[in-house]
């Protein structure tokens, strides 16, 4: 199975939405809450995104928001979890982010999920809450020391 990770393009948005709405954890209460226009704004105006393709199908993606210093999204299609793809998308995204700025980056995720475990293992530090989610932060120095 050949995987290819590349920068996201506008034509990827429908498949990005499919992946986002296929997840079993951190599900949107209403899929209409995240529009194609939102995806476009975060991908091309506020930050940058990456996708992983297998046989022309997007199976995962990551998006970082430079304006709010936030990981806006990191999602894998459930059929392609536990293959190391999420880790690669995460690392490419953070490498790029910290090439742009040395400001701390943060994210929120639901407690008791595999995502929580993933971020803890990846060196993210718990920094309180964001709504009902756990807020995690990564500093420039923590990231560079992990590389």
Language-model features, listed with the residues they occupy:
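Conserved beta-strand in the GNAT
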Residues: 51, 57-65, 70-75
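Glycine-rich acyl-CoA binding loop
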Residues: 52, 82-90
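A short helix-loop-beta-strand connector motif used in the catalytic cores of GNAT acetyltransferases and
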Residues: 40-51, 70
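Conserved GNAT-fold acetyl-CoA-binding loop/helix
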Residues: 13, 17-44
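A short, internal acetyl-CoA/4′-phosphopantetheine-binding micro-motif in the GNAT/acyltransferase core
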Residues: 74-82, 109-110
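Conserved acyl-CoA
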Residues: 88-104
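A short beta-loop-alpha structural element at the N-terminal edge
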Residues: 2-18, 127
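C-terminal "cap" of GNAT-fold acetyltransferases
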Residues: 50, 102-116, 120-147
């Amino acid at each position: 199975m050949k995987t290819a990770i590349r920068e996201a393009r506008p034509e990827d948005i429908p498949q990005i939405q499919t992946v986002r709405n296929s997840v079993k954890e951190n599900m949107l209460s209403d899929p209409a809450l995240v529009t194609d226009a939102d995806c476009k704004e975060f991908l091309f105006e506020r930050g940058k995104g990456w996708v992983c393709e297998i046989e022309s199908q997007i199976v995962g993606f990551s998006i970082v928001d430079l304006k709010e210093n936030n990981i806006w999204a990191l999602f894998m299609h459930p059929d392609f979890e536990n293959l190391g793809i999420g880790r690669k998308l995460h690392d490419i995204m953070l490498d790029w982010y910290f090439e742009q700025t040395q400001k701390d980056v943060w994210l929120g995720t639901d407690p008791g999920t595999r995502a929580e475990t993933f971020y803890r293992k990846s060196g993210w530090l718990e920094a309180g809450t964001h709504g009902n989610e756990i807020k995690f932060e990564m500093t420039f120095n923590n990231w560079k020391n992990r590389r």
